[in-house]
């Protein structure tokens, strides 16, 4: 969901409904969904994230349903409703990437230190995310919008596969800006925070090769969890902010 203040976790006990995309209603319309929620985990995550200085609210008594970023993975990975689901807002409109990295790290700490169970993190976003210009959508249904964005994505994927996380984390703000990142790639910052940020020593295992969709760059990859200390996680920004900050600072 799109958020403008704090971070939000949708942890209702049960989700059921029908979804139509407000972005591409002719592509995704009346999609039925149902899954079990996990109120206990959602509330724990919010508590620990807030303790880490990242204000996070858990919503269990809500009529708000999951959206595209949650529903698409569920359609292909949870048709039997085996897994419980917690939805974390990642379309962040006025947030610091550093705070999203800290959020991811705090969630890992919550799970490893306080939760009795196995949890998977799904960062549901994209690489470059420049939709095809109006009138050209059919032509770019299975293409990336520009050669620049396609080459930019290709280099990023190679960095992931080679484990070049220090370089990638350093370039993430500029990549998010110049690559038209969906939600400014806060989902990626959260994922890398959970993995240890630039300290992370794993390599991405590409499940489906890079492909274009409506002008955007897409991939499915698995990032194995490795032992880390958290020493490279960026400090929080929002809770330490004092009045107006420039756009460059917020990035």
Q: What residue ranges belong to the model's regions?
A:
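Acidic/histidine-rich, metal-coordinating catalytic segments
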Residues: 121-129
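Flexible, D/E/H-enriched segments
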Residues: 5-102, 113, 134-250
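Structural motif
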Residues: 84-86, 118-121
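Non-transmembrane, aqueous-exposed alpha-helical and coiled segments at domain scale
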Residues: 105-119
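Short, small-residue-biased leader/transition segments that mark boundaries at the very start
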Residues: 1-3
């Amino acid at each position: 969901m799109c958020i403008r203040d704090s971070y939000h976790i949708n942890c209702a006990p049960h989700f059921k409904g029908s979804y139509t995309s407000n972005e591409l209603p002719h592509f995704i319309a009346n999609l039925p969904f149902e899954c079990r929620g996990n109120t206990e985990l959602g509330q724990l995550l919010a508590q620990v994230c807030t303790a880490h200085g990242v204000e996070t609210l858990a919503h269990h008594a809500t009529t708000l349903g999951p959206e595209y970023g949650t529903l698409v993975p569920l359609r292909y990975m949870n048709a039997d409703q085996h897994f419980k689901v917690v939805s974390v807002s990642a379309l962040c409109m006025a947030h610091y990437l550093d705070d999203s990295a800290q959020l991811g790290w705090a969630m890992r700490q919550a799970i490893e230190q306080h939760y009795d169970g196995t949890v998977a993190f799904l960062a549901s976003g994209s690489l470059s995310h420049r939709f095809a210009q109006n009138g050209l959508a059919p032509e770019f249904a299975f293409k990336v919008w520009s050669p620049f964005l396609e080459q930019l994505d290709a280099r990023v994927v190679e960095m992931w596969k080679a484990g070049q996380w220090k370089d990638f984390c350093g370039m993430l703000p500029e990549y998010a800006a110049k690559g038209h990142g969906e939600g400014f790639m806060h989902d990626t910052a959260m994922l890398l925070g959970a993995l240890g940020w630039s300290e992370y020593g794993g390599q991405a295992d590409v499940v489906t090769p890079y492909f274009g969709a409506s002008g955007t760059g897409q991939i499915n990859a698995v990032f194995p969890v490795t032992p880390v200390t958290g020493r490279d996680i960026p400090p929080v920004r929002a809770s330490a902010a004092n009045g107006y900050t420039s756009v460059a600072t917020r990035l």
